[in-house]
């Protein structure tokens, strides 16, 4: 995503290029930004997963700018010297021909430690909290299911009119989608609890019981998500 107006400051969010196709797409976009007289203020990363960070070596061949992100995200980029640490309530301001655009940082660390969203008048840059199709993985390795559900509720409380998500198309009028996500995760949480109470004692058996309504689910992912709920 690119924040800001044509001819003003621009912030590039999650460029995440890792191959030639991505390189060419970003290169074309940056050329378009520069052609309209804009300056690139910074690169903002919503979280530290590689599908959002991309290859910094490739990115730096196209443009150089300070990197902004949470402490956890910046710790994954030790080679970057010019940085700004973002945390809850911080304001990202980009100046443009018609005025200043402000985006408030909101922490939603459930999917990944240090994940942030950016809340502005056009909507919310919502990182990996939800998507139009399917569900979002909350890795048992470093995710936090309770924090993830709380983050969804936090997003819903804003009553945003658009979510700009990390995967798939933007979500217009997202209250319904957020409610579905919250209800789905809470229901799955209860099914995991029921599996334990019924006597299931291995992760495999808990996952089979908790995901009995989706027999086609990938067994490894089902076990990982069951562990996250546990």
Residue map of PLM features:
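Surface-exposed cleft-lining segments at the edges of enzyme active sites
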Residues: 134-142
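C-terminal regulatory/interaction regions
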Residues: 194-230
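Active-site HxH/HxHxD metal-binding segment of metal-dependent hydrolases
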Residues: 17-101
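Active-site neighborhood of phospho(di)ester-bond hydrolases with catalytic His/Asp-centered motifs
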Residues: 13-15, 39-49, 67-71, 107-110, ...
């Amino acid at each position: 995503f690119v924040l800001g107006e044509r001819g003003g400051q621009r912030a590039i969010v999650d460029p995440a290029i890792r191959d030639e196709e991505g390189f060419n797409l970003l290169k074309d976009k940056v050329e378009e930004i520069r052609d309209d007289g804009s300056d690139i203020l910074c690169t903002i990363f919503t979280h530290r997963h590689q599908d959002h960070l991309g290859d910094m070596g490739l990115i730096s061949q196209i443009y150089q700018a300070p990197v902004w992100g949470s402490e956890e995200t910046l710790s994954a980029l030790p080679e970057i010297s010019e940085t700004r640490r973002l945390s809850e309530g911080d304001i990202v301001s980009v100046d443009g021909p018609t005025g200043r655009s402000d985006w408030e940082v909101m922490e939603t660390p459930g999917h990944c430690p240090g994940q942030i969203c950016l809340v502005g008048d056009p909507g919310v840059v919502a990182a990996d909290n939800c998507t139009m199709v399917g569900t979002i993985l909350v890795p048992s390795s470093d995710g936090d299911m309770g924090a993830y559900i709380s983050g969804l509720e936090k997003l819903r409380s804003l009553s945003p009119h658009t979510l700009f998500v990390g995967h798939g198309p933007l979500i217009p009028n997202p209250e319904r989608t957020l409610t579905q996500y919250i209800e789905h995760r809470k229901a799955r949480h209860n099914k995991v609890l029921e599996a334990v109470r019924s006597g299931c004692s291995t992760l495999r058996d808990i996952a089979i019981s908790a995901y009995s309504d989706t027999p086609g689910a990938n067994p490894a992912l089902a076990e990982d998500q069951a562990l996250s709920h546990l």
